């Protein structure tokens, strides 16, 4: 009787135990990452050939305590290696784990190699060769705390390498994990299976091998036991022959039918090649198809199981498309696959919620480093039957209400960009902005007290509802996460797409970029202030400080300003401002762009202006500015510099986003300035729900105010 260990992916241990027991294994004991079991030589070979779930089958050789590298060396050397393999064979060591004495796995592997080589040298005065590539013998050593386990790896290469897969599409599943997904899906041999995003076909091929009683290891060319002295060649041939007979008979007798599709023609060709090499090509129909065009391959029955590993994104920009994909898949399942089962494996349970289906069962497993979940659904017999769930219904209703009111208003105003929703409902803490045909959803960073997974689920619900209410293609929705700005964060790029969209605001054309920066190049809440500046600037010299992308300069120029001067510290935004001026025909020497620290420039400038617009940051500590700036603390010093630049009968429009900002009226009076708050007049209908989005003031020389 042999004592053996089968390793597997985390989460599959109990499934592997059942599989080994079905093969005839005894004394099965589940541990994290695998199963200890016992069996005779036939069972040893059968577990290698027939296990669909094991990663490796190991034959333990010794276990001992390790308090030093000498303990490791002596424990390995105590094994009679000459009885395990011949000196003419090559070997390799796989060492995992560390402790206080063995702190590096490479060092541990080196000590094990030395011990094995020295064992041969002392006994027969010859030494075997170490080979990193395709060794004849693989020795596995696992060190945990002060215990080391040494085993012979009978598998060679991992057992998931069945021998049928050549090339793979993006993000392939290991064959052993694919087999587990199939077994957990609820699918029964003899019934149909469909994978609508099949990639290289692994799920379908593993299912077809199960249906046709084909041993998963039948196509493997290399094994870890062929150079082992305990290898029984005749018994192995007998086990192989039995498996070949079963595979031929199973292929003839199976009634299962399999269907796979993918939008990528290249991976479908790979899938067909993989199925041929696996010996199950005649059972699987592959075709190139978009999920959006998915239909039931057996509309008249019988019913079967849809099994799929849909894509899940790690990049923020991919999430709207994935949400739309899952939502669409859910609708197709409900409308065309009544009576079928659905089983999806994903690293994103939040995306699975976008199906708007209730799962009957779910399982957890690891896919490499990723924590994944598999959810099984029973699809109702009637099309679009019961079992669906409404997602973010309150949010959708509010968005619908806002859209009805604001869409008509925006058209009357002659604007393409406006805010549709701004955290109206506390549980849906986002802003939704429309820019022509596109929509930007900005998630306000949730408080640390809110569960991260719950916040992510709500965000996915918001995107799902926004796409539905606005009837928007997923590629027209841009997702961003907004946090409190620190220093120069607002100037840092989020992406490198360089895609600009030309939008209209009253009589102005303006370039926006919805993807590359946190802000888009157009502050929507200042729309009315910009229009007022245009009306104030006719025949006058206009100065725009902290100008950003120069949109206020555009309105002033279109309003008939004699000149515009646009000052900002960012070259990127000045180039953007120049584009905005140029597209509106505002070119020439009378439209100046100045790259400078605005605070320093104001102190050194020796010219005057009729209209000055200044919208400084609430706080800044940019390296390019000599000192920090706080708008509450420093606004009086700011006005002192501006007073010198302001002509008689001139006007300063001063705006900022500081909540609770208090204007120092006494200080202004001492400077010889008067101020009038015009915040209410600058707030448009789409920001009526957020009265504190900004505050705005008009300042004049004392005695000139109206």
From Swiss-Prot:
SMART domains for the chain: THUMP
GO CC annotation, single: cytoplasm
Cellular location(s): Cytoplasm
Residue ranges of domain THUMP in the record: 43-154
Top-level taxon of the source organism: Bacteria
Keywords attached to this entry: Cytoplasm, Methyltransferase, RNA-binding, rRNA processing, S-adenosyl-L-methionine, Transferase
Major localization listed first in the record, in broad terms: cytoplasm
Any GO molecular function: RNA binding
Pfam entry (one): Methyltrans_SAM
Class of the enzyme per the UniProt entry, highest EC level: transferase
Catalytic activity, reaction form: guanosine(2445) in 23S rRNA + S-adenosyl-L-methionine = N(2)-methylguanosine(2445) in 23S rRNA + S-adenosyl-L-homocysteine + H(+); guanosine(2069) in 23S rRNA + S-adenosyl-L-methionine = N(2)-methylguanosine(2069) in 23S rRNA + S-adenosyl-L-homocysteine + H(+)
Enzyme Commission number: 2.1.1.173, 2.1.1.264
InterPro entries associated with the record: 23SrRNA_methyltr_KL, DNA_methylase_N6_adenine_CS, RlmKL-like_Mtase, RlmKL-like_Mtase_CS, RlmL_1st, SAM-dep_methyl-trfase, SAM-dependent_MTases_sf, THUMP_dom
Coiled coil: none
Entry similarity comment: Belongs to the methyltransferase superfamily. RlmKL family.
Known role: Specifically methylates the guanine in position 2445 (m2G2445) and the guanine in position 2069 (m7G2069) of 23S rRNA.
HAMAP family (UniProt xref): 23SrRNA_methyltr_KL
Protein name: Ribosomal RNA large subunit methyltransferase K/L
Species this chain originates from: Serratia proteamaculans (strain 568)
Source organism phylogeny: Bacteria, Pseudomonadati, Pseudomonadota, Gammaproteobacteria, Enterobacterales
